[in-house]
Amino acid sequence: MDIREEKIGSSVKVMIIGRLTADCADQFKQYMQEALARGRRFVLDLSEMEYVDSTGLGAMVFVLQRISEAGGELKIASLQAKP
């Protein structure tokens, strides 16, 4: 998994590239907790995410809860339908 970040107006766009699985879920959670120091409004761009397992999905829910607790907002964009 790679993570790229881009500031767009008052939002921070975070792009997940590759696979979000149990192997990297903690890395994703840590990255997003650190990102809270840079903003409160996030767009999670999943256009380049190839796969997410249940642990990765749980990490996204964890991140959503932390952002909400901090008074922020998280939107998910470009979710790809895969057969």
Q: Where are the regions that the model predicts?
A:
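Amphipathic alpha-helical interaction surfaces in cytosolic regulatory modules
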Residues: 20-83
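Short beta-strand/loop segment at the start of cytosolic alpha/beta domains
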Residues: 1-15
